[in-house]
Amino acid sequence: MSGKRVLACDICKSRNYSVTSAKKSDTRLTVKKFCKRCNGHTLHVETR
C-alpha cells in the first residue's frame, strides 16, 4: 500500500516536494533537498 507524502522545508515551512512511499511507516521522513524560497539545501520533513 503506497501513500503520498508531502515534504516541507524545516526553515520556511514551504511545501516543496511530494513523494510516494512503498509502505506506511510510523517515523517521519527527513531528507535534505533544495528549497526555492531559502535558495539553498535545507532539511525537509514529512508533514502530517
From Swiss-Prot:
What's a BP term from Gene Ontology annotated to this protein?
translation
Gene Ontology molecular function terms on file: structural constituent of ribosome
Pfam short name (any one): Ribosomal_L33
Q: Which UniProt keywords apply?
A: Ribonucleoprotein, Ribosomal protein
Q: Which InterPro entries match?
A: Ribosomal_bL33, Ribosomal_bL33_sf, Ribosomal_zn-bd
* SS bond partners: none
Any one GO cellular component localisation term in the record: ribosome
Alphabetical list of HAMAP family matching this protein: Ribosomal_bL33 (MF_00294)
**NCBIfam families linked to this entry:** PRK00504.1, rpmG_bact
Family, per entry: Belongs to the bacterial ribosomal protein bL33 family.
Question: What is the protein name given in its UniProt record?
Answer: Large ribosomal subunit protein bL33A
Q: Which organism is it from?
A: Shouchella clausii (strain KSM-K16)
